[in-house]
Amino acid sequence: MKTIILYGYPGECEISEQYLKEYKIQCFSEQEELVPALMETRPAAVWVIMEKAAGMEGVIAVRRIYPDLPVIWFSNDGGFAPQAYRLHVNYFMLMPINEDKIMTALKKYGFHAP
């Protein structure tokens, strides 16, 4: 079973988990929890579901450990799209999260969409 790490607010993680039932999900809301989890095992992808600078800091933390890992970033601020591009984020999308956005992200990276 593929593992997807969700780094985001608890409510957003719960919404995402509804659509990711076929995956082992680990959800973290603090960067201090995210980094050790990334170092323990390489996930199939990381989904950053944070707004503004908090989301960018999460992406930077992932990129320091896994420069080539698929990263999907959901933000509430489209102004962070240039930073997403600079940080080689694979998929940048604006909140709110919904089923269509999740399914698009899954299909784009070769995951089986439930």
Predicted regions and their residues:
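Two-component/phosphorelay signaling modules centered on CheY-like receiver
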Residues: 6-33
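Acidic, metal-coordinating helix/loop segments flanking the phosphotransfer/catalytic sites
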Residues: 29-45
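Extreme N-terminal starter segment of soluble prokaryotic enzymes
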Residues: 1-4
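CheY-like receiver
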Residues: 45-113
